Amino acid sequence: MELTEAIRRRRMVRSFAPDPVDPDLVDRLLEDALRGPSAGNTRGVAWVVLQGGDTATYWEHATTADWRSSARRYPGLSRAPVVALSLCSPAAYLDRYGEADKRHSGLGTSDSDGNRESAWPIPYWFGDAAFSALLLLLGVTAAGLGAAFLGNFRGEQPLLEALGVPDGWRFFGAVLIGERDGLDHPSPSLRRPPAVGAGAIHRSHW
């Protein structure tokens, strides 16, 4: 599938078949996802892949029992055979931008309270995690599978601890991967007009 076709075909899938996905394909998709832009070539993004029964760890910590029992979409989402968790390391970027060739940026310095993150108007670590997640979504689409991105809303620290993630890493979001089961209900959000064309692209001036 050509890139333009993958971009235009990509949709968030919220109902999956439980059929397993080839682990070699998952590895290839993640390797491609890690080829995205990386500020200062820091490479401070990583993925934790949960497959089969291991996906329950994600749902247990990132959602609540009330939500799981009441959300109409939960059964379809929870059938996704792969849950890939996008992680990023703020410390990796803070250290990288404190090195000699980046020190002039001022992004590796601390404020009066010793907070090194306050110098960053837009933290690069979240941007790089987003680039990687988008590449994974596009790669999954190009492979003929369905995918959905779920943000980090709750349970971040317990989830990281349960997975043995080293201290200092942040959970950015989860990409669900699997075959579509044909039972997805279109999101009401799709009724909103797309942000394309003259309304969203401005030349020379807003």
Language-model features and meaning:
Residues L3-V13, C88, A92, F172-W206:
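C-terminal helix-cap and adjacent tail motif
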